[in-house]
Amino acid sequence: MQGDPMPDQILQFTHPPVPRQPPVKPSSPLTWPDDALNRPFLKERLDEFQRWLADAFDAGETAEILVDARTLYIDQLLRQLWHYHGLAHAPHTALVAVGGYGRGELHPLSDIDVLVLSQAPLTPPQQQHISELLTLLWDLKLEVGHSVRSIAECLEEGRADLTVATNLIESRLICGDLALFLTLQKQVFSDDFWPSRAFFPAKLAEQQERHSRYHGTSYNLEPDIKSSPGGLRDIHTLLWVAHRHFGATSMDEMVGFGFITRAERDELNECQSFLWRTRFALHLVLNRYDNRLLFDRQQNVAQLLRYQGEGNLPVERMMKDFFRVTRRVSELNQMLLQLFDEAILALAPDEKPQPLDDEFQLRGNLIDLRDETLFSRQPEAILLLFWQMVRNRHIEGIYSATLRQLRYARRHLKAPLCTSPEARTLFMRILHQPGAVKHALLPMHRHSVLWAYMPQWSNIVGQMQFDLFHAYTVDEHTIRVLLKLESFADESQRPYHPLCVELFPRLSQRHLLLVAALFHDIAKGRGGDHSQLGARDVLEFAALHDLPAEDAQLVAWLVESHLVMSVTAQRRDIQEPDVLVQFAGEMQSESRLHYLLCLTVADICATNETLWNSWKQSLLRELFFATEKQLRRGIHVSPDVRERVRHNRRQSLVLLRMEGIDEQRLQEIWSRCRADYFLRHTPNQLAWHARHMVLHDHDEPLVLISPQATRGGTEIFIHNQDRPYLFAAVTGELDRRNLSVHDAQIFTNRDGMAMDTFVVLEPDGSPLSPDRHPVIRQALLQILLPGDYRHPRVRRPSSKLRHFNVDTSVVFLPSPTERRSYLELTALDQPGLLARVSEVFVDLGISLHGARISTIGERVEDLFILADGDRRALSRAMQAEVRRRLTEALNPNDKV
């Protein structure tokens, strides 16, 4: 059971800078003569100072020192310019720093927010001087925000706007009338201007609203250093509330008031220092103010922060540290705001704690220790806390004093909690309870108890993957998988996941599915096959927790096979009998199939919110029901393909006879179709095609677009004289229209007519918008007109794709038939890819019979069904040539 035994270690991978001689600091603005204060001189001095900030940071200076230096530099610049523009002697006027500038937090690109405070309305000359000053600052490319107000106006605006009130609370005098500024301060901190009982709940609501914009987690892989949960704003919120209630202006003063311990202060300081350093580095690589760690910035920031490793490892290590820091800030923020709540909005005296048992009591809806030494004396009692939470659903959280004791006990653990037999018993009892994830595992994760319980968990805490596919860190993704599984017990989810809601309550060992979910990605980031490594880990867990051998085999199989169903449904040809037989053989039983379907759906939904759509749902349903039939028929009994062809024709004919179809004309058309056409379409699809082909001029191109969603997407059917590059032309046009092709069935009749079917989706994964049908149909008819093939115009690639590299891989899968070859292509997603691939096939005389298209973030993983000119599988020599040509076409820098 390998892992980091220190759940309270924050930073793991940071490397100290190589010490070197710091650069010489530029001169103070206060030393500049008045006759030099022109725009070119000032621009040169500011550029010089920005270069010094970057050089000093590179030399190892701390962000704290440099942020203070920029704040002081801007203070001195504004004082000098205030004097230069004749404002120093303006009566009863002051220049005040507000917002982040008021706090003294000026990073390289931070806004400079100032208040011009005046007792009386400004005179026209004063207005002119201030306008000239601001214009100069803007010309110098400084991001200056300003307001001009009297004390009365400040108070009026502040009472109406919480943000203005907060800015006033942390205001700081730069220059001007001190007495006027102190009068403002006295008013701002009076009891009738945002008293603590109003200010605290307002700031709490503001934080909750901000968190909701980030889906309540800091684990989005492109986080905002300032505003994401656990970011700098959460630290600011603590400081604002402490400042307003206690007058504390620093963490040291908060210790003095007894509201945080020295250890908590040190932890907050360490977290803030890391966030400041990361934000400082981000500002150095940008030209415009922004606090988002977007993918295209992460590599440069990691390099500035001196993270080491090959490939994407520096980014992954930096982000792992980042997510561990934000996790710690979130926990401290929750605990300390609750302490403020108790101090500011104290419980009424008659609201006494209500005993739960000998160890715990309720304070309102929060669980609290009756003996604060319990966790230190008996660490396994930490699990007892979460056992109570899952049994008493009305408990909404942990009381601050108990959370403080939990943090202390967690920090002083001598061994993982799972080494305690009592803790193991409690953990398994928790997993058996309804609501175990929401009421126990989720808070256990939030408070690092999962880490303290099972060492393997530490490896994935904050573990990201540098791609566009995974939206969350591995630990956050795993928790979301668990939550999604638990949601399948909720009848309200039936419209979204009807099959899973039907199956999940019938699973006899639902707790084993939770164990499998906990371990399905536990080995990510270790190297090697994470499914196999995770299966070994879960077997160790099963042995330690005395699971029966049959249960251990099930969870190990689920972990090792957790990707099999998704891959088979999306990237294999399940119409081929051998593919279905092989998949059914891997399932072995309907019970295992049911478990795996629930895990697969939860895994897809929890990977990326945009990933699950009706198309994927239809693929999994199709595979699920086909496999159920196969298991009932006998694992190794191949489906009767000829009977399926006859069945589809018969059922389609029944539908068409009800409409009075011209059967003679229909049989003429069907007689030219090959068996595969009837095998790979449903009776409804066959009838839809036929009713239009019977009435259509055989020599004219036919384009049909399904009015309703088909298999979760929009089906486009094309009947036209076959010709080279037809597939390339169609897919190129669809791509240019920003439609994604997810499936293609390509047939050429005995008379040389193409009958091609495409399933397409809009960029958001929805079926084609009905108002686009006429435009798309007309565009396709246009490209079907006779004429030479022209390379389709392609869309501009996404800017995000420029920052990713995917090695082109061409693999020929084992073929169940001598008539087809199955090519699996992995490459960087790019506009016009399908057209480019198709052109290679045409140039080599290869016919394309089908395609299954899967886009996973920045990479495509596509399956192509091919045959040579003699309608047979490709020779080894031809496979090698295809591999070479595709690699050249998709990535000229790759070598075979």
From Swiss-Prot:
It comes from the Bacteria. InterPro entries: ACT-like_dom_sf, ACT_dom, HD/PDEase_dom, HD_domain, NT_sf, PII_UdlTrfase/GS_AdlTrfase, Polymerase_NTP_transf_dom, UTase/UR. Residues 1-31 are annotated as: Disordered. Uridylyltransferase (UTase) activity is inhibited by glutamine, while glutamine activates uridylyl-removing (UR) activity. It catalyses: [protein-PII]-L-tyrosine + UTP = [protein-PII]-uridylyl-L-tyrosine + diphosphate; [protein-PII]-uridylyl-L-tyrosine + H2O = [protein-PII]-L-tyrosine + UMP + H(+). GO terms for biological process: regulation of nitrogen utilization. Residues 356-714 are annotated as: Uridylyl-removing. Residues 474-596 form the HD domain. Its cofactor is Mg(2+). Residues 16-26 have a biased composition (Pro residues). Residues 1-355 are annotated as: Uridylyltransferase. One of its GO terms (molecular function) is [protein-PII] uridylyltransferase activity. Has four distinct domains: an N-terminal nucleotidyltransferase (NT) domain responsible for UTase activity, a central HD domain that encodes UR activity, and two C-terminal ACT domains that seem to have a role in glutamine sensing. PANTHER family: BIFUNCTIONAL URIDYLYLTRANSFERASE/URIDYLYL-REMOVING ENZYME, BIFUNCTIONAL URIDYLYLTRANSFERASE_URIDYLYL-REMOVING ENZYME. This is Bifunctional uridylyltransferase/uridylyl-removing enzyme. It comes from Sodalis glossinidius (strain morsitans). The lineage of its organism: Bacteria, Pseudomonadati, Pseudomonadota, Gammaproteobacteria, Enterobacterales. The gene is glnD.
